[in-house]
Amino acid sequence: MMMDANEIISFIQNSKKKTPVKVYIKGDIADIDFGPSAKTFITGQTGVVFGEWADIEAALEANKHKIEDYVVENDRRNSAIPLLDLKHIKARIEPGAIIRDQVQIGDNAVIMMGAVINIGAVVGEGTMIDMNAVLGGRATVGKNCHVGAGAVLAGVIEPPSAKPVIVEDDVMIGANAVILEGVTVGKGAVVAAGAIVTEDVPPYTVVAGVPARVIKQIDEKTKAKVEIKQELRQL
C-alpha cells in the first residue's frame, strides 16, 4: 500500500540523519576504538573502517599520532532516507539506479541504469522504468507499463494534501515526457515523447504536445508500435 504524504513526512522527520563514511587507513591502528557505529576490517597496519563520520572523525583526531595516512569516501550528508535493500526484490534492477527506501517494486519489473525512484513511489509488476527516468515521491505506476528514458513523473510530498501522479496499467510513456502533479494517465494510454501532461489522460488514447492533448484513440497500428515484450521482464 502506498504511503500517504503525512506518513512520509513523519518518516523523514523522525529518521536519524546519517553521514556514513568508508575510511581506508594505515598505521598503528589495531587497538583504536572507532566508535559505536563502526565496523572495522583491519589486518596488521592497514584496514578499512565503515561508520558514522562523527564517530570516526573523533577517533581519527584522538589517535592521529598512531595514524600514518587515511582516505575518506563519503557520498551523503545528514541523509534522512536510506536506499532500498534490493537483495530480495524479485525484479531486474541494473547498476546505477537510485531507489530510496519505502519504494514498492512489483515482481518482474525492470529498473534501468540511472533511473531515480523517490520515497513512497510504486512500480507495478512487469513495468519497465527506462534509463534516467525519474519517479517523484508517491508517484504510482501500474502493471505492464513502460516509462521511457528521461521521462519525469512529478513527485508530491508537500503540500501533503496534493494528489500524486497515477499511471494505470498498460500505459506507454515516451522518452522525456513529463507528467505533472495530480495527473492520472488512464489504462492503456500512450503519452508521446516530449509531451508535457497537465491534465488527466483518458484510457486508450494517445496524447502529444505541449501541453499534451488527445490526438487519437488507440488503434491496432498504435498497439503494434507500443507492444510490451515480456521477454525483457523474465528473471
Curated annotation (Swiss-Prot):
Pathway: Amino-acid biosynthesis; L-lysine biosynthesis via DAP pathway; LL-2,6-diaminopimelate from (S)-tetrahydrodipicolinate (acetylase route): step 1/3. Pfam families: DapH_N, Hexapep, Hexapep_2. The keyword Coiled coil does not apply. Its EC number is 2.3.1.89. GO terms for molecular function: tetrahydrodipicolinate N-acetyltransferase activity. Keywords: Acyltransferase, Amino-acid biosynthesis, Diaminopimelate biosynthesis, Lysine biosynthesis, Repeat, Transferase. GO terms for biological process: diaminopimelate biosynthetic process; lysine biosynthetic process via diaminopimelate. It comes from the Bacteria. InterPro entries: DapH (IPR019873), DapH_N (IPR013710), Hexapep (IPR001451), Hexapep_transf_CS (IPR018357), Trans_hexapeptide_repeat (IPR050179), Trimer_LpxA-like_sf (IPR011004). It catalyses: (S)-2,3,4,5-tetrahydrodipicolinate + acetyl-CoA + H2O = L-2-acetamido-6-oxoheptanedioate + CoA. Catalyzes the transfer of an acetyl group from acetyl-CoA to tetrahydrodipicolinate. Belongs to the transferase hexapeptide repeat family. DapH subfamily. PANTHER family: 2,3,4,5-TETRAHYDROPYRIDINE-2,6-DICARBOXYLATE N-ACETYLTRANSFERASE, ACETYLTRANSFERASE. This is 2,3,4,5-tetrahydropyridine-2,6-dicarboxylate N-acetyltransferase.
